[in-house]
Amino acid sequence: MGLDITCVDIDKKKIDGLNNGVIPIYEPGLEEVVRRNVEEGRLHFTTELTDCLDNVEVVFSAVGTPPDEDGSADLKYVLEVARTFGRNIKKYTVLVTKSTVPVGTAQKVKAVIREELARRKCKVPFDVASNPEFLKEGAAVKDFLSPDRVVVGVESERARKLLPKPYRPFLINNFRVPF
């Protein structure tokens, strides 16, 4: 798609493996996509979100939401990303949640980011958006490259204008992204 992407994970072993070309999951076509984009300098891996926040406008968060004891989604990883984001942003950035989360999660994410900014005594503008995945296991690469739909939920006009950028290749082919 021509974008520079930095993938962040707290698992150092996983990141070391990815930096050495070891893909921790099997998904048809994924190894080739990763290899090609690493070779072309567009794909990077790190354990530190802070390594990439200075030069980005959009951060996509795709973390696990395992079921909690009562069967609801456990949002601890989603909220930990929000905490790290709030502790480290320096300029306007949009945090986009890709994970499957319940209605109202964006408000919780915003509250966590605001708390972290208040602790820092900072007034950095930000937005939170939702962009759920519609990828089938075994067909994720194909589904990503040829989506039947892309849905993005935003609250601000600023985020609405910014978020089509990552989807520009789809928009060029008359693919509609509803906001």
Task: Set out the residue ranges of the language-model regions.
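Structural/interface elements that position substrates and couple domains in central-metabolism enzymes
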Residues: 1-179
